[in-house]
Regions:
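Catalytic binding pocket for nucleotide-activated donors in carbohydrate/polymer assembly enzymes
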Residues: 1-89, 95-96
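C-terminal alpha-helical cap of glycosyltransferases
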Residues: 102-118
Length: 118
């Protein structure tokens, strides 16, 4: 499934996603090593957010080859086995991410009001 709710539901329960960066998965999973800036923009919605890496939420890879998948899995497993404290904090952080419709709904309401006033 290129997107859907699976990854967002699983994160809520502590699963750390390892995904191929395609479709909606690319829109919702931000690689812990390479996508801090994009995660800060997409999750927090603001470029003035202090980029600390707190918005990253998984491990991703490009392409469809076995090497890409292996690389992403190796990074995930390495962090689990070699830095368990970091991994647990990472799980807690992604469990707190809000993927509800609250923020998008408010964004749309603000857009509609600005169009009416404009």
């Amino acid at each position: 499934e290129p997107c859907g709710l699976t990854q967002m539901i699983s994160m809520r329960y502590g699963a750390v996603p390892v995904v191929r960066a395609t479709g909606g998965l690319r829109d919702t999973i931000f690689d812990v090593d390479t996508e801090k800036d994009r995660a800060a923009w997409e999750v927090d919605g603001s470029t003035d957010w202090k980029v600390t890496g707190d918005a990253t939420n998984g491990f991703s890879f490009e392409g469809t080859d076995a090497g890409g998948l292996e690389y992403a899995l190796d990074r995930a497993l390495d962090s689990y086995y070699n830095d368990r404290a970091w991994f647990r904090k990472f799980q807690e952080r992604i469990m707190r991410q809000d993927w509800s419709w609250n923020r998008p709904a408010l964004d749309y309401i603000e857009l509609y009001y600005s169009a009416i006033r404009g």
